[in-house]
Amino acid sequence: TIARATNQLNKPWCLNVFVDNSGVIDFDGENAICFKVETHNHPSAVEPYGGAATGLGGVIRDILGTGLAARPIFNTDVFCLGEPDMSYDELPPGALHPRRVFKGVHAGVADYGNRMGIPTVNGAVLFDERYTGNPLVYCGTAGIMPVWAAKPGQQSPGDLVVLMGG
């Protein structure tokens, strides 16, 4: 597995992998970079805006919960959706039209990230009929933290986290 291979390599710049809310690597000896991605497919198929927004919110939360809290610095996304020109007659029963899903997931990810003040720096969109009714909505966030704060399990009850969006 990827986890086993990474652990066998035992690189000193891999500070926190497969044990906390996100993977952390040493960037320059003083700063560490962390990254987390996940999918939010079914929720986005049912309610595109909310499903995608909460998918992005989950990875932002995981960055904040890594070690002693990283600062989110950017978001990324990949959307795989059904063909946008599909006729409504071709839709499976209960499926939303791919155009509606696309507009909703795009707006959900954009709104959530923008309101938090975290830019989306890249993304991709793939249209294929196989994603009709079952989109792939892949969201990710990167963060930065001091190397000393990258180890898991150092939080204490009563610690406070303050996050303000714009």
Language-model regions: role of each:
Residues 1-166:
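Long, structured ligand/cofactor-binding scaffold of large enzymes
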